[in-house]
């Protein structure tokens, strides 16, 4: 779980992802002296992407690229590069936990490097079997460089 100082609340009334929530997340990172030249990312679920696409400021060519309306994609906004994922957790299936971070705030570790094998299976009519595995994990390295944004989902 995240420290209270690193969370953006769901709001009152509860809302999905809004520009105000993104501004607050940016402010939290800035107040924690996160280097503004470091790339910043925001992992969102498809519903949060839809929330942003429904906001005129985000899709307006005055504020963002025309790509937002033409292709239904938002690449960057307020300095965050958006990554869409269906694997973000939620609280009681109601509030999605969107994560925003500076590049060096998270660390990826490789426990076991890639193992790949390609064999024939005699018991399956000599069909080709492909086996591929690796062990990886990620964690917050610096709490102040990672922010949780709670977003209501309907």
Where is each model-derived feature located?
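Sequence/fold signature of self-assembling virion shell proteins
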Residues: 55-154
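Short amphipathic alpha-helical segments, especially helix-boundary/capping motifs
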Residues: 1-3, 103-104
């Amino acid at each position: 779980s995240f420290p209270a100082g690193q969370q953006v609340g769901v709001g009152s009334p509860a809302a999905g992802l809004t520009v105000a929530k993104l501004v607050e997340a940016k402010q939290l990172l800035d107040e924690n002296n996160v280097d503004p030249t470091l790339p910043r990312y925001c992992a969102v679920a498809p519903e949060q992407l839809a929330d942003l696409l429904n906001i005129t400021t985000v899709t307006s060519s005055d504020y963002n690229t025309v790509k937002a309306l033409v292709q239904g994609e938002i690449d960057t906004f307020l300095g965050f590069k958006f990554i869409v994922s269906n694997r973000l957790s939620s609280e009681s299936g109601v509030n999605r936990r969107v994560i925003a971070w500076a590049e060096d705030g998270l660390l990826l570790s490789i426990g076991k490097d890639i193992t790949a094998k390609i064999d024939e299976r005699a018991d399956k009519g000599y069909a080709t079997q492909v086996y591929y595995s690796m062990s990886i994990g990620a964690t917050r390295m610096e709490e102040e460089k990672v922010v949780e944004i709670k977003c209501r989902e309907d």
